[in-house]
């Protein structure tokens, strides 16, 4: 088949939807943020993890962090396996595509790593839900580029991997990753904002009480 005939519109004809590994990868991608949002909200309301670790919120948060990190490794393994089961597309096998893939992987990992360095373990892995709040909003890089560097950096890494393998199925799964993360952000941002708003209201109330006592 001539390369010209293999246009962009033809990309998704190179996705083998019958492969079980594709569905499993898509399920893992959706499961992870669903899992950590459910667990974190339950922790916020009931402190079930903190109680399980003898009242130590820090240790409980680290436990959730390790769990989330482990699930991320499983998700990445399943994604790579799904790509290996899929056909490649000639348009995605060029030299410049590979350069773009490496650039996306580098930038994606830069966003993820620097955001983790800015927030720390508890800031990255939902410490707010455990009552471990940061003093203020982080505004330095990468948060001056995007408000969700972990999510967008991860999406860039998924896209970079898809291009590196030359797999249209990877592009499809990357679009799914982005969709899932955007939905997660819609749930997480307002909830987290309310946690800090509540902290600020309590501080203001305490300050007002102190002034009255004086």
UniProtKB/Swiss-Prot annotation:
Membrane-spanning intervals of the chain: 53-74, 102-122, 166-186
Segments on the Lumenal face: 1-19, 41-52, 123-165
Record has Lipid biosynthesis as a keyword: yes
Entry's Gene Ontology molecular function annotations: phosphatidyl-N-methylethanolamine N-methyltransferase activity
Any one GO cellular component localisation term in the record: endoplasmic reticulum membrane
Pathway terms, separated by semicolons: Phospholipid metabolism; phosphatidylcholine biosynthesis
HAMAP family xrefs: PLMT (MF_03216)
Protein name in the entry: Phosphatidyl-N-methylethanolamine N-methyltransferase
